[in-house]
C-alpha cells in the first residue's frame, strides 16, 4: 500500500493521519500527528481463536522518553515497565474499544501505541485513542467501530475540548469522554464539585466533538480500509442449549434468587456441578468432549445471565431482594487501628474497605518523571484487592492494571477536597485494603478514605462519598440500578461510578458492555446517584460529624516558614554544611522546596521551635531604624563592629558612639560588650551602619566656666569607662569594612 495522508483541523490544532508507510506487516497501522504530538499505532490479530472464556484484548501505551527530548531515569537509562500514567492511558483506550467486538470473538488482539514525539499542548493520549480505533477500523480485524475520545475542560464557565496545558491547569474539570457516533460508551473524570447539570453538558458537548473525529475516520476507512476477515466466533450447540435449559433452568432460577451472596454462589455452583457431571458422563468417550464441555459451561453462564436480567426487568426484583434504587445496609467506623495516623472502615452490604492514612513531610512526595516536566505528587491513594476478599485463592503480588485504575479513581475523587499545601504542609498517603467485595469496592474505598482523613485531622473541605450505578437494557427498555453488587456488575450493561460531596461531583467513571448509552440514561443515572450519595454522606457525618481538630499523637509534627528564594543557599550552606548542623543540633528533619518553603518536622515540638529560631536567624535581614541589642566583636581605630544577630554585623563609626567627641574607641567599648544600636544605613552592597548615640539623649548645651569659657570636659555616656586621655585620632578610612 502506498503512503496516503489525510488532514483536518480539530480543536484548533492540525490533525494529520498517515497510512501505508510504516509498520506495514501489522493488520492495521497509522501514524497520527496532532499538533506536534506523534503516535504510531499498530493493531495485530492472532490467526486462531484463543482458548479461554474471555476476549484476549491487550492495549498498550508506550511513552518513549526521546519523544520529549529526555533521557530515561535510573541506572539503565532505558524505558522499563510502563509508568502509572501510561497504564491508566492504556486502560482509557481499552475501555471504549472492548465493547466494539462481537460476542463470542476470541482471537487475541493487540493494539500498541508508541508516542514518538510529545507536545504538551496536544493530547498524545487522545491521539493514541484515535489511532487505536483507526488502525483497527482500516485493518481486516472484525472491529465494529470506529470510536473516538476527547478531553473536556471547564474554564470560566466555558466547555473546552482538548484544553491546552495552561487551560487544563485552570480547569474545574478533567474529563475524558469516548463513544461511537451514536452514543457515549466511556467516561473518566475528576471535577471540583461540579453540578450534575454541568457534568451532563460537558459529556454531551464532548460527544459532539467525538462525532467529528469519527466522521474523519470514516472518510479514511472508505479510502484505505481492508475487507474484514471471516473469523470463527464462539457459539454453543443449539440443541444442547435447549436440552439443558429445559432440564435445569428452573433449578438455576431458584439458586440465583437466593439473596445472600455466598449462599447464592454455593446454590448456583451445586446446579452447575450437577449439570457438568451429567454431561461429563454422557460424552466421556465423545471425540469432541472438550468442545461439548466448553459449551455446557457457556450455556450455564448464559442461563444465569438471562435469569438475573429477567428478575430485574420483568419482576423488578434484584437478586438480593432490593428495590432498583435501594442501597445495601451501611456501616462506618473510625479509629479502627491504633498507632496509625488515621483509619476508617466502611461497609456496604458485603463490600468492605479499610482505609489507612499516613502523613509525612513534603520530602516524601512522589517524583513523577514522565514526558511532561518533572513534578512532585503530594497525595497518593493506593488500592489493594486481595483474593481473600471474594473468598478465593489467586495471584498475589504487585498491583495490576485494575488496582492501579481503581486507586487513581479514588485519588481523583478525594484530591478535590484536600487542603492546600499552605494550609496543611504534609504529604498524604491513603491505602485502601478491600477486605470483602460484592461489587463497588472502589467506591467503598472512597468512603473509607473520607473517614480516615477526617479521623486523622486532615482539614478536608467536605466529606466525599461514592456510589456505583448499573444498567439492564434490552434495547427498548432499561432499568437503572443503584449500588450494584457483583452479580449485577457481571451480568449488567453498565458500571457508572459517581463520587462527590453535597455540593457537587468530584469524580466519574463509566464502562459499558453495550455500544453506548443515551443522554436520557445518563441523566437518570446521575439523579439516582446524587440521592444515594447523600444517603451515604448522612452515615459518614453521623459517624464523624467534623474533621478532628488535632492530628493523631503518632503523626509527625510539622511546621513551616517561608524564606526568600535567594536565602535558600544560606540555610543549606556549602555542601549542605549549615542545614546538616541544624539537623544534628536539634534532631529535626528539614525539607526546603525551590519556592523557599521550609518544612521542619519532628515528634518534639521544642526541637521544631529551636530549628525555626536558628533558620529565622540565618535569613533575618537588618532594617533601617530597627534597634538591636548587639555584641561588640571587633574594634578598629575608626569604630567598632557589632553583631546584630547570627552572621549579620554592623559598623558603629566612632562618630556614632557618643554625642561628644572621643579619640579612642576603647574609651567607650571593649570586645564582648553588649550595647544597644540603631541601624541608620544599609548601602547597595548590603553593608550596615549603626549608631549608639542615636539611642542616647542629646546632651544639653555646654555650660560656661567662671571666666566665660566653655568647659572642655566631655559628657560621658553611662557605659563609658574611665581612661587616661590619649592622643586624638581623626583619620577615617576609605572603606569602613
Curated annotation (Swiss-Prot):
Entry-linked CDD domains: KH-I_PNPase, RNase_PH_PNPase_1, RNase_PH_PNPase_2
Domain KH: 556-615
One GO MF term: polyribonucleotide nucleotidyltransferase activity
Catalytic activity as recorded in UniProt: RNA(n+1) + phosphate = RNA(n) + a ribonucleoside 5'-diphosphate
EC number(s) per entry: 2.7.7.8
Enzyme class: transferase
Keyword NAD: no
GO cellular component: cytosol
Composition bias, Basic residues: 715-724
Binding site for Mg(2+): 489, 495
A Pfam family per the record: RNase_PH_C
Location of the protein in the cell: Cytoplasm
InterPro entries in alphabetical order: ExoRNase_PH_dom1 (IPR001247), ExoRNase_PH_dom2 (IPR015847), ExoRNase_PH_dom2_sf (IPR036345), KH_dom (IPR004087), KH_dom_type_1 (IPR004088), KH_dom_type_1_sf (IPR036612), NA-bd_OB-fold (IPR012340), PNPase (IPR012162)
Basic and acidic residues bias spans: 700-714, 725-737
GO terms for biological process, alphabetical: mRNA catabolic process; RNA processing
Residue span, S1 motif domain: 625-693
Chief place of localization: cytoplasm
Region (Disordered): 691-737
Cofactor list: Mg(2+)
Keywords, ordered alphabetically: Cytoplasm, Magnesium, Metal-binding, Nucleotidyltransferase, RNA-binding, Transferase
Function: Involved in mRNA degradation. Catalyzes the phosphorolysis of single-stranded polyribonucleotides processively in the 3'- to 5'-direction.
Family the entry assigns: Belongs to the polyribonucleotide nucleotidyltransferase family.
Protein name, as recorded: Polyribonucleotide nucleotidyltransferase
Originating species: Streptococcus pneumoniae (strain JJA)
Amino acid at each position: 500500500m502506498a503512503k496516503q495522508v489525510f488532514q483536518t483541523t480539530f480543536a484548533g490544532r492540525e490533525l494529520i493521519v498517515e497510512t501505508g508507510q510504516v509498520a506495514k506487516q501489522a493488520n492495521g497501522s497509522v501514524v497520527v500527528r496532532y499538533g506536534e504530538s506523534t503516535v504510531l499505532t499498530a493493531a495485530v490479530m492472532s490467526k486462531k481463536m484463543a482458548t479461554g472464556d474471555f476476549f484476549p484484548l491487550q492495549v498498550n501505551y508506550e511513552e518513549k522518553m526521546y519523544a520529549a527530548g529526555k533521557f530515561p531515569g535510573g541506572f539503565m537509562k532505558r524505558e522499563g515497565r510502563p509508568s502509572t500514567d501510561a497504564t491508566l492511558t492504556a486502560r482509557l483506550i481499552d475501555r471504549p474499544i472492548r465493547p466494539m467486538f462481537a460476542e463470542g470473538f476470541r482471537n487475541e488482539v493487540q493494539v500498541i501505541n508508541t508516542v514518538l514525539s510529545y507536545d504538551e499542548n496536544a493530547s498524545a493520549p487522545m491521539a493514541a485513542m484515535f489511532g487505536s480505533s483507526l488502525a483497527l477500523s482500516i485493518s481486516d480485524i472484525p472491529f465494529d467501530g470506529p470510536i473516538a475520545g476527547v478531553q473536556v475542560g471547564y474554564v470560566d464557565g466555558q466547555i473546552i475540548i482538548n484544553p491546552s496545558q495552561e487551560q487544563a491547569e485552570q480547569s474545574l474539570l478533567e474529563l475524558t469522554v469516548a463513544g461511537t457516533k451514536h452514543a457515549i460508551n466511556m467516561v473518566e473524570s475528576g471535577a471540583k464539585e461540579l453540578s450534575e447539570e454541568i457534568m451532563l453538558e460537558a459529556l454531551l458537548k464532548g460527544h459532539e466533538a467525538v462525532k467529528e473525529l469519527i466522521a474523519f475516520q470514516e472518510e479514511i476507512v472508505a479510502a484505505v480500509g481492508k475487507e474484514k476477515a471471516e473469523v470463527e466466533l464462539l457459539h454453543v450447540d443449539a440443541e444442547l442449549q435447549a436440552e439443558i435449559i429445559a432440564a435445569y433452568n428452573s433449578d438455576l432460577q431458584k439458586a440465583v434468587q437466593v439473596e445472600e451472596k455466598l449462599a447464592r454462589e454455593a446454590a448456583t455452583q451445586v446446579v452447575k456441578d450437577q449439570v457438568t457431571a451429567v454431561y461429563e458422563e454422557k460424552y466421556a468417550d465423545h471425540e469432541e468432549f472438550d468442545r461439548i464441555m466448553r459449551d455446557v459451561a457457556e450455556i450455564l453462564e448464559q442461563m444465569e445471565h438471562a435469569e438475573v436480567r429477567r428478575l430485574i426487568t420483568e419482576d423488578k426484583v434484584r437478586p438480593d431482594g432490593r428495590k432498583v434504587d435501594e442501597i445495601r445496609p451501611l456501616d462506618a467506623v473510625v479509629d479502627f487501628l491504633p498507632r496509625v495516623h488515621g483509619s476508617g472502615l466502611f461497609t456496604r452490604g458485603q463490600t468492605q474497605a479499610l482505609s489507612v492514612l499516613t502523613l509525612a513531610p513534603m520530602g516524601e512526595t512522589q517524583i513523577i518523571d514522565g514526558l511532561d516536566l518533572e513534578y512532585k505528587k503530594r497525595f497518593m491513594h493506593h488500592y489493594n484487592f486481595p483474593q481473600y476478599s471474594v473468598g478465593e485463592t489467586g495471584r498475589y503480588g504487585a498491583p495490576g492494571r485494575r488496582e492501579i485504575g481503581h486507586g487513581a479513581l479514588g485519588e481523583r475523587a478525594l484530591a478535590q477536597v484536600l487542603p492546600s499545601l499552605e494550609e496543611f504542609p504534609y504529604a498524604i498517603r491513603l491505602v485502601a485494603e478491600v477486605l470483602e467485595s460484592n461489587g463497588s469496592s472502589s467506591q467503598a474505598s472512597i468512603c473509607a478514605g473520607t473517614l480516615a482523613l477526617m479521623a486523622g485531622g486532615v482539614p478536608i473541605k467536605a466529606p466525599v462519598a461514592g456510589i456505583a450505578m448499573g444498567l439492564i437494557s434490552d434495547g427498548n427498555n432499561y432499568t437503572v440500578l443503584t449500588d450494584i453488587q457483583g452479580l449485577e456488575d457481571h451480568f449488567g450493561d453498565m458500571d457508572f461510578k459517581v463520587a462527590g460531596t453535597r455540593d457537587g461531583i468530584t469524580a466519574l467513571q463509566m464502562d459499558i458492555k453495550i455500544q453506548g448509552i443515551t443522554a436520557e440514561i445518563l441523566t437518570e443515572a446521575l439523579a439516582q446517584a446524587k440521592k444515594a450519595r447523600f444517603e451515604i454522606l448522612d452515615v459518614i457525618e453521623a459517624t464523624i460529624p467534623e474533621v478532628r481538630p488535632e492530628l493523631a499523637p503518632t503523626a509527625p509534627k510539622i511546621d513551616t516558614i517561608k524564606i526568600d528564594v535567594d536565602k535558600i543557599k544560606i540555610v543549606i550552606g556549602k555542601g549542605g554544611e549549615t542545614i546538616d548542623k541544624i539537623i544534628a543540633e536539634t534532631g529535626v528533619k528539614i525539607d526546603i522546596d525551590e519556592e523557599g518553603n521550609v518544612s521542619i518536622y519532628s515528634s518534639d515540638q521544642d526541637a521544631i521551635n529551636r530549628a525555626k529560631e536558628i533558620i529565622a536567624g540565618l535569613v533575618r535581614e537588618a532594617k533601617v531604624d530597627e534597634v538591636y541589642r548587639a555584641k561588640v566583636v571587633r574594634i578598629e581605630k575608626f569604630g567598632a563592629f557589632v553583631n546584630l544577630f547570627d552572621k549579620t554585623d554592623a559598623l558603629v563609626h566612632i562618630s556614632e558612639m557618643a554625642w561628644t567627641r572621643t579619640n579612642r574607641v576603647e574609651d567607650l567599648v571593649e570586645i564582648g560588650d553588649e550595647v544597644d544600636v540603631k541601624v541608620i544605613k544599609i548601602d547597595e552592597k548590603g553593608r550596615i551602619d549603626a549608631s549608639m548615640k542615636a539611642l542616647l539623649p542629646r546632651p544639653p548645651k555646654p555650660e560656661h566656666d567662671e571666666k566665660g569659657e566653655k568647659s572642655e570636659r566631655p559628657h560621658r555616656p553611662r557605659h563609658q569607662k574611665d581612661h587616661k586621655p590619649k592622643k586624638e585620632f581623626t583619620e577615617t578610612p576609605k572603606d569602613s569594612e
